[in-house]
Amino acid sequence: MKKTKILVIDDELDMRTFLSTLFETSGYKPLLAADGVEGLQKAREAKPALMILDVMMPKEGGVQLYRDLKSDPATKHIPVIMLSGIAKKTFFHSQNLLNQYTGKSLPEPEAYIEKPPESDELLAITEKILRAKRGNLPNV
């Protein structure tokens, strides 16, 4: 059986290793990227079922990468879980400001989890999002 691909985009090696191990031992196929530029390329090439995206990264940060992903016809359908040390309220405030500034409103990510993530919570949210995607049900 083909394993479901999950793209993890995070600049912290320890976090990529943790998430890769968590997803691999849970039956998924983790794909890894260390920054937004690499992440966007892998998202386009690998077409993962789900992306885990850190907010604060070098080269292209998670906020800009999220906007790029959701503006690209090839990747806009891929669900995203934002994972960050930044408070959820702060992230959504910045998204709203960018939406107003650019005049382009984008959908909110399927989930936002503050670091460090609890394994059980992350896996439960991941499965819920993937189940909804398979059944074309509303997201989390």
Regions found by a protein language model. Give the residues of each.
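Conserved sequence signature across two-component system core domains
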Residues: 9-10, 33, 51
